[in-house]
Amino acid sequence: MSNALQRRGLHGVGVSELLSQAACPKGVLYHHFPGGKIELAIAAIDSVVTRMQVHLAALAEQPEPLQALADWLVQAEQQLQTSGFEQGCPLATVALETSADDTVLRAALGRAFARLRCSLGALLEKAGISPLRAEALATLVLSAYEGALLQARVAGDNACMHTTSSLLLEILRHEQNNNKLEPL
């Protein structure tokens, strides 16, 4: 499900396609996910975020967390390019499709983004950035990354992702080396 969300979004993928990919009958879907496709999407989002949190925690334990983050950003650029600029972040893809009426889905996405910011903040703290700055910078990193990813998908080119990643890392390294700045 998360791959379908990354490529085509919630409204771009049908229940029949999901059932076909999973090789299961419709009754199984509605037995485990009585809320249908929305409930399944929320479960997929939670699963993706959990995997990302585990990955970010592993990056934070590296001897150089910022270099590990830099390597991960390069890998994300390569993955996007390899997918033909189709495989973006499933959270962003679904978020762009929501309306004000999608309160349950929007709440789940809000929690998912908050979890990612928390994990990024923990990584930045491990890199030697003060907790208050790490929290604010995690918001910047996630927001800039998602925006650059969106632009790269639209343009079919990684240039904006590369520029954004480079500048983010420059800012983070400056913070790491200059940990005397006032909190935001």
Predicted regions located by residue number:
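Short hydrophobic clusters on alpha-helical segments that form packing/core surfaces
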Residues: 1-5, 145
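Hydrophobic alpha-helical connector segments
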Residues: 57-87, 138-141
